[in-house]
Amino acid sequence: VMNSPATHIARDASNSSALQLLARLGFAVNGLLHILIGSIAITVAIGAGSGSADQSGALAQLASSPGGVFLLWTVVVGMFALGLWLVVSAFVMQDEPKRKWARRLANIAKAIVYIALGVTALTFARGGTSSSAGSTQSASSSLLSSPGGVIVLFLAGVAVLGVGGYFTYKGAAQKFRSDLAVPGGSAGRAVIALGVVGYVAKGIALAVAAILVGVAAVTNDASKSTGLDGALKALAALPFGTSALILIGVGLMAYGLYCFIRARRARL
């Protein structure tokens, strides 16, 4: 019910300048993480590094940098705030019922991803470590050893493939333009170019990760499911894989730059 007390509270929260400012911080730190993931992917591709080309690798790189603890706590606050803003805004959006519920579910799914990333960042900020690839393998192993787990894992792969497809479509069709106020002239063209390249690259990376999850399910081998890091390194092992990984690394960095621009110009 749109006029319920809970809806009024949610609307007031979503319009809160403090929460909106923190959500913009969330977009910015998400951009920083993608720039780091992209740079790690490129160093792995050219054989100059061996870090994890995923969120854990990016957080580990932050942890080892000057002022790393402060940066990690900034990531924690930004990710939690962005997750909270997505949940709150899900309940005040206006649209026709079917589309509204689809958008609500999408917002809540994204919120879960950001909050989970915030929890991982919190682990690093408190001096711990975490491995996205290891967590993915562990979760896959648990599923494969449970009744019906193969089907659940395969469906998880299909879901991730769907997300990858959505990112690719959103980039290629420039559907992201409604998310932010695109400036005019050459600056606007640059923002659109970053969005197209960034979303398509992220979509391809997620699609490769999804295929590995599917392979793990079909072969009943959890070691095949290694998340984004494993997906990018598997890509590097293919013919022309080094070039492909460099291009995806550049694309992920483009997505990171787009996130920085979105932090400034997002429609909240």
Segments predicted by a language model, with ranges:
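Peri-membrane helix termini and adjoining interfacial loops of integral membrane proteins
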Residues: 46-57, 128-138, 177-180, 220-229
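Hydrophobic, ordered structural segments
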Residues: 17-18, 36, 40, 67-173
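Alpha-helical transmembrane segments and their membrane-interface junctions
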Residues: 118-134, 203-221
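Alpha-helical transmembrane segments and their helix-start/interface "positive-inside/aromatic belt" motifs
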Residues: 17-34, 101-114, 193-204
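An N-terminus-focused feature that recognizes amino-terminal "leader" regions
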Residues: 2-80, 263
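Juxtamembrane inter-helical linkers in multi-pass membrane proteins
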Residues: 176-192
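Short, membrane-exposed interhelical loops at transmembrane-helix boundaries
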Residues: 56-62, 138-143, 222-243
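Alpha-helical transmembrane segments and their immediate juxtamembrane interface regions
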Residues: 152-163, 232-268
